[in-house]
Amino acid sequence: MHNGSGRVRLLILIFLQGLLVVRSSSSVVIAADIASSSPPTGRDPVASLQRRLDQREVQLEYATPWGYLLSVLKQLQVPLSSQTLVFSRTSFQQFLISPATPRALYFNDTVYVGWVPGGDVLEISAVDPERGAMFYFLNQKKAATPQFIQREECLQCHESPRTLGIPGHLVRSVFPDSDGLPQLQAGSYQTDHTSPLKERWGGWYVTGTHGSQRHMGNVWVIDKDKPDQLNTEAGANVISLQSYFQVSTYPRPDSDLVALMVLEHQTRLHNLLAKAGIESRVAQEQQTAVKRALGEPVAQWSESTRRRIHGQDD
């Protein structure tokens, strides 16, 4: 009997390990599955603000030409000084975006807010402590009780290998034409804190001085037969954007390079933290399944689970 039970135990273990190997063959698929199937925690800042609106604890004020933008920023404690401006058509309301009408993006530690002049909606993403990024729209039509609506279509771009396979954030640098359309045949860059300056800010406005280094911002492709050639000298060390578009349309007249660099660092960090949290939960769920099947104490971690969560050196 002892040998028989041992063989059964071994077969169960082999079977379960096989399932885990199959499931672990793509960490992107696992993380995306866990993140997408988990219910919202309701603990992200936008969900919290919606509860306060529903309970009449706060109100959103509407102001032309920005709609609810300024009030949303105030309630979510997002500073206007975080404003960055992107004129490439690489977001949801792309047909309204151009070098003459860039999209404004504002952020703090846990929220990103996008506004386009004349846009139907505010585009908002917030950091959920378990699921990663949560995406919302807020209709810009004046309403008695504005509603933040969760939108899954944002995941078409915001859940991919570029975001580590989870709902996340990304900053892109492209070769835009004079209408803001990315010339994708020239390629593009995903920007984070490790990116060299020369590959940053294609399709973005950039204000501030940066010495002799050059970047891709403030300019667009002139010759579509040579889409990877930008006059980076013309876009360097720009102090004012008044010659590019009507800056009075926006709450601020700038798109500060320091704000851009913080944004690029933060989006990558948010994705890494979310990925680590999701994969830790995956490891614990798989550990629980194996332990229960073998009749062992669930609370006792195996060495392999400990290494997956804490790393090889722990």
Question: Which positions does each model-derived feature cover?
Answer:
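Serine residues within intrinsically disordered or low-complexity segments
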Residues: 5, 24-27
